[in-house]
Amino acid sequence: ACVAEALQVESKGRELVKQLEQRMEGITDRACAARERPRVACLEWLEPLMAAGNWVPELVQRAGGANLLGEAGEHSEPITWESLLESDPEILVLMPCGLDMKRTREEMYWLTDRAQWKTLKAVQNGRVYLTDGNHYFNRPGPRLVESLEILGEIIHPDLFAPSFKERAWQEAG
């Protein structure tokens, strides 16, 4: 809205903000109708491990998940392997700061080379996902609406068509 005001297109800016808010509300409403809220951990860095903070915990909650690590409105924090193992997420979303999916896949050895990796419920159930953190999760802005859509697709694939799959997220496999 501030940019629109500076460019003297305030009404267009207000309309765009309204459209983005409506998209977010629609996603949240659909996700909240889900019977289950899977336990989700989002990692913003792989070595050392860092739990995603800032806006990501709120996005997880709005997408119908129960955020396990990181606090909404707080900076991303380093975590221990023990805390990741104790939280034992049903879904693990990798969104390293500044990395695209190709680079994230290359860096996964920081996780997969550890013996404990295979003990995680998300790993055992094939619910580990790579995202393009650089484009969708690591910066605030209007694109966070798409970030919410991506998390909806990952957390509740039965409720959301995979329109961002392969382009913005993929199964770690």
Tell me what each language-model feature is.
Residues 1-173:
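N-terminal ligand-binding lobe of clamshell/alpha-beta domains
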